[in-house]
Design a protein with these regions (language model features):
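N-terminal DNA-binding module of tyrosine recombinases/phage integrases
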Residues: 1-20, 68, 249-253, 257-279
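Basic/aromatic-enriched alpha-helical hairpins
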Residues: 1-38, 54-57, 247
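Hydrophobic (often cysteine-bearing) scaffold residues that line and stabilize catalytic clefts
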Residues: 4, 25, 43-50, 93, ...
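Catalytic-site neighborhood detector that most strongly recognizes the C-terminal catalytic loop/helix
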Residues: 6, 83, 144-153, 165, ...
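Short, basic/aromatic-rich helical patch in the C-terminal catalytic core of site-specific tyrosine
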Residues: 29, 51, 122, 128, ...
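Basic, Lys/Arg- and aromatic-enriched nucleic-acid-binding interface segment
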Residues: 36-52, 60-131, 139, 150-154, ...
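Active-site/catalytic core of tyrosine-dependent DNA strand-transfer enzymes
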Residues: 40, 91-98, 140, 149, ...
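Short, polar N-cap/turn motifs at the start of nucleic acid-interacting alpha helices
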Residues: 67, 135-142, 205, 224-245, ...
Length: 280
């Protein structure tokens, strides 16, 4: 399926995609696995399995001979042992999000509105809770989160969809400094407000931050979005410093198409949304 090929596309093809299949050995496979073996171990493990299958098929068709380098790497224990890390930000499966969002829409609490917006934008909790009206350009359908609230230290532009605007536009009437005002006038909500709402909804184990992972999985598995577009949607830095210096675009319009489709999926209006395959 799409997820199978996407793993190879993102982590193997850039390094070994143009090589003759009979010239791929341990050093070439390690070039793909080593950079992500510790930080993204589960992804690296799946990548190794898929490279192994690919090379086994090539051997069965007579395109290569000898031992599979994945088997040799495993037997020689070339790569370090990785302790299973606890999942700090447990994520909801993307298939479960529309039903969860429908439930969320029935709730009037400000925390529910903030959580809906967080889920749709894939933003970090602090970015949403600190959101102020002067950061929003309704005419351009754009929210610019300033650098001082961004983990990466750079301002981030977020395209606003109809569903996102439907959440925040009614809140303008409150005339607060903050879009999602807390219990005190002109003060933001507590950073625990959305998490406590999840607990009241009896959504066990899921964290607010986890919705970023949910979006990322959906973007790869369902939308088949280019890696750069999906990563930039989460305000992740893509490429080396030199590559970023040359690629000055933040891919806003491509991200807008992706976020429109995500909003349509989450809010149950998929049929109205333009297919990203045609645009991205």
């Amino acid at each position: 399926g799409a997820q199978w090929i996407n793993t190879l596309r993102d982590y193997a093809f850039p390094k070994i995609g143009r090589m003759p299949v009979d010239s791929i050995g341990q050093p070439e496979v390690l070039m793909c696995l080593s950079p992500i073996w510790t930080e993204k171990h589960e992804t690296a493990r799946r990548l190794a399995q898929r490279i192994k299958i690919m090379l086994d098929v090539a051997k069965s068709k007579g395109f290569r001979s000898g031992e599979n380098p994945i088997t040799a790497i495993h037997d020689a224990q070339v790569l370090p042992k990785v302790k299973a890390k606890p999942k700090h930000h447990k994520a909801m499966q993307w298939q479960e999000v529309p039903a969860f969002y429908t439930d969320l829409k029935t709730r009037d609490a400000m925390a529910a509105k903030a959580l809906m917006f967080t889920c749709l934008t894939g933003s970090r909790t602090g970015e949403v809770l600190g959101m102020q009206w002067d950061e929003v350009n309704f005419a351009a359908r754009l929210w610019t989160c300033p650098a001082d609230r961004m983990k990466g230290g750079e301002a981030h532009r977020v395209p606003l969809t109809d569903e996102m605007l439907a959440i925040i536009e009614p809140l303008r009437a409150m005339k607060s400094k903050y879009v999602f005002e807390g219990q005190k006038r002109n003060k933001p909500m507590s950073n625990m407000a959305m998490l406590m709402l999840l607990r009241r909804m009896q959504v066990e184990g899921v964290t607010v931050h986890g919705f970023r992972s949910t979006f990322r999985d959906w973007a790869s598995e369902v939308a088949n979005a280019p890696r750069e577009v999906a990563e930039m949607s989460l305000a992740h830095k893509v490429g080396s410093d030199v590559e970023r210096a040359y690629a000055r675009s933040d891919l806003l319009e491509m991200r807008r198409v992706l976020m429109e489709r995500w909003s349509g999926f989450v809010a149950g209006s998929v049929g109205k949304v333009i297919s990203i395959e045609k645009r991205v």
